[in-house]
Amino acid sequence: LFPIGTLYDPFIARGLDALNYACYQDARFMVVATPSGISLAPEGGAHQSISTPMIGMGQPGLTSFEPSFGDEVAAIMGWSFDHMQAKDGGSIYMRLSTKPLIQLVRDLSDADKSDIVSGGYWLREPGDDCKMVIAYCGAMAPEAIAAWEKLSEDHPGLGLLAVTSTDRLYNEWQDLE
């Protein structure tokens, strides 16, 4: 049995002592936070979560994700329950949006799911003549897709990178050095 909790994303800092202690004690849990990002909080600047991604990236024992689409959430949750049970696993911090997004209609392969939980995948693969890539995370997907559609004619080979976990991408990049 693993606890799954929800919270208002900007207020995760209020529980940092407990979060740090739980992660260092190897507690296993999933925390789901909304709303993520700076463009989503109708309450105004005092309630925007611009520093919370760093909490997810910086806390040992906690893996953070910020998916855009429902099928990404499903892939991440499937991986997360295995990760929470693994001897070398840990806890999960998932940042979600309250912004309505039109969902993609697609069947994810095992390779697609692996890319999603690894931190990112090409929503539009770059061509051989790629000189530019648009990367997005979370609720900014519609704006990034619209930008790709607008720019792809003038920029052949333009890629569109969906980042589902800055945490996992950064840590894997660090492991390469």
Cite the ranges covered by each PLM segment.
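A broadly tuned preference for mixed-charge, low-complexity surface segments
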Residues: 54-62, 151
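Secondary-structure boundary/capping signal
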Residues: 2, 63-64
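Thiamine diphosphate
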Residues: 1-55, 64, 72-78, 81-177, ...
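A generic structural signal for alpha->beta connector loops
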Residues: 26-28, 61, 155-157
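Solvent-exposed alpha-helices and their adjacent loops that cap or buttress functional pockets
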Residues: 22-25, 31, 55-58, 84-88, ...
